[in-house]
Amino acid sequence: MSPRVYRISVLLSVLLAEVPVGTNLGLFWLLWALISGRFLLSRGAVFPALAAGGLAADAVRRSGAALAYGRWAVQPLVRAWQQVVEQEGRWRAHRYEGFRPVACDLVGFFRPHLSGCVGKHYQSGAAKALPAIVFAVVAAVGLVGKVRLPLLRLVLRADPSDCSEAVLQRRALRQAGAALQSDEVLVVDAGFGLADLLTEGVPCFVARVARNFTARG
């Protein structure tokens, strides 16, 4: 096993240490397929991506079952990743005038033929909103060496009972704002309303607004 492969295996094992036995192995192979780029080759299809990695058919089925029915959640994995990166001490947060930026945005995975909880997300190429599974992503901005690396902090999916982006945005702002340190500032683009930033109690933020924006303090 090459040092790089061994290193990735150790990191994945640390991230999955608190996941129940059985589910942890299934997620290990899923994350390995994701890191290796096999999901790009399979266009997001789970079973072909796993099979392309050389897994036996029964291992592919167990890994797919871990994804769909296993006892796990995204946020504990995100927290584990954040702790690992910070403990290694190589990641450095960007600072501007003493403040550390924390970015917040919505990301859409476009699935026009998927049934179920599918919202809509604006796609610039189509110049309109298209059916998509929408996530809110919050990440601290920093670098490792000379390479910029966002340190993921929060991943939220729309509530199945209400897939609107507006509701998801407010949830993201509320949770991201509550987790900000005294020297951190939340950075959002024009898709986030100033009223929502204030209503959800974000203590410090930088927002992109329209050129003709007017405010009164």
Task: Give, region by region, the residue ranges found by the protein language model.
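Gly/serine-rich nucleotide phosphate-binding loop at the start of the catalytic core
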Residues: M1-A68, A73-V74
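Active-site-proximal, Lys/Arg-enriched surface segment
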Residues: I35-S36, A68-K146
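Generic hydrophobic, aliphatic-rich segments that mediate packing or membrane embedding
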Residues: A45, A59, G98-V102, V134, ...
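Short, conserved catalytic/metal-binding motifs centered on acidic residues
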Residues: A49, G98-P112, V138, D183-L194, ...
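A generic secondary-structure signal
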Residues: A52, Q87, Q175-A179
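Electropositive, glycine- and tryptophan-enriched low-complexity nucleic-acid-binding patches
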Residues: A59-A65, S124-D183
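An internal, acidic/charged active-site-proximal segment
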Residues: L156-G217
